Amino acid sequence: MIVIIDYDTGNTKSISKALDFIGLQNKISSNHAEILQADGVILPGVGAFPEAMQELGRRGLDVTLKEMAESGKPMLGVCLGMQLLLESSDEHLFTKGLGLIPGHVEKLPDEPGFAVPHMGWNQLEIKRSTPLTKKLGGEYVYYVHSYYANCPNEYIIATSGYSVEVPSMINKGNIYGAQFHPEKSGQIGLEILKGFKEVTESCKSSQQ
């Protein structure tokens, strides 16, 4: 069972439908016990970093997610959810993140020919093979964002070119992040979610 974190700031239903499509049992929940009992979690996110962290904190979900990560169970952050995995952000004001992956969130440079927010399809360049990236090449995925994750290269598993080289996917241990929306990226997005399914099943088997 995968729990999609419900904190009133995410595209939970579209992610749930995508997981249903690939046969991955899931539920949308903010219940601490359900989250900790899950085989893995997906942290969605749409909106601003400070408000999202405030809402996670108000519900005590920041502590729950850190406990989940410490257990070694898989986690996938999507769009803003990926950014929340990092240590901090400059969006509107300096705000601490969950600190699960080293890095800082910065605004995309507003340069001629590169609109901010970045909305639309962009090509992936795979930097490292993982269960989520092993079937990917130069496919296009769908983005909607104004900020990006500035993190050490060792945690970047895919990028896309824009006004800067945007870390498209990041990874540390069983924690993954996707800056784009897999649930809106067609078949290639489903392949990424299948990779996360593989990680959760492998982790579950090793813990039994």
Swiss-Prot record:
It catalyses: 5-[(5-phospho-1-deoxy-D-ribulos-1-ylimino)methylamino]-1-(5-phospho-beta-D-ribosyl)imidazole-4-carboxamide + L-glutamine = D-erythro-1-(imidazol-4-yl)glycerol 3-phosphate + 5-amino-1-(5-phospho-beta-D-ribosyl)imidazole-4-carboxamide + L-glutamate + H(+); L-glutamine + H2O = L-glutamate + NH4(+). It is found in: Cytoplasm. It comes from the Bacteria. Its EC number is 4.3.2.10, 3.5.1.2. InterPro entries: Class_I_gatase-like, GATASE, Imidazole-glycPsynth_HisH. GO terms for cellular component: cytoplasm. This is Imidazole glycerol phosphate synthase subunit HisH. GO terms for biological process: L-histidine biosynthetic process. Keywords: Amino-acid biosynthesis, Cytoplasm, Glutamine amidotransferase, Histidine biosynthesis, Hydrolase, Lyase. The lineage of its organism: Bacteria, Bacillati, Bacillota, Bacilli, Bacillales. Its main location: cytoplasm. IGPS catalyzes the conversion of PRFAR and glutamine to IGP, AICAR and glutamate. The HisH subunit catalyzes the hydrolysis of glutamine to glutamate and ammonia as part of the synthesis of IGP and AICAR. The resulting ammonia molecule is channeled to the active site of HisF. Pathway: Amino-acid biosynthesis; L-histidine biosynthesis; L-histidine from 5-phospho-alpha-D-ribose 1-diphosphate: step 5/9. Heterodimer of HisH and HisF. Transmembrane segments: none annotated. One of its GO terms (molecular function) is glutaminase activity. Residues 1-206 form the Glutamine amidotransferase type-1 domain. Pfam families: GATase (PF00117). The active site is at C79, H181, E183.
